[in-house]
Amino acid sequence: MADNKKIIEGLQIIVTDLAQQADGHAIQSKIFAAQGFSKLGEKYAEHAAEERGYVDKCIDRILDLGGEVKNEAKKEAPVYTDVIEWIKYDLQVSKDCLAWLKDLTEEARDDYTTYDILKEYYQDEEEDMYWAEQQLELIEKIGLQNWLNHQI
């Protein structure tokens, strides 16, 4: 049987960390759009909105499980003007998250509702990781300037 306390704690970590990631993606969206890379700006704006949706689902699930949602302080996160540095940073965040998230998803296997939420979030985070890896490979193949031209 799933350990609700451990699951609630895990969901709270997601709420706190993912809210910060959503804010970070929103900030990066504005920075890239201001640099003239509207497609990249739109991608990260959409990503921020998607992450906020997962935050909402996790908050709802904490409440459904009888937990108390906390509005915890968020760690300071870097802001980048260099696209490559940002993608590398974001890729590492995804990689770090996936190992931990896999364990939490396994912990929730008997709580089908939480399991489904975590599985969906895991799949989304995995797609983000693959996208970042593909973009870095593409930049290496066609060059940064050519890649940036596609982001206008």
Model features per residue range: what roles?
Residues 1-152:
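Iron-associated oxidoreductase/ferritin-like identity signal
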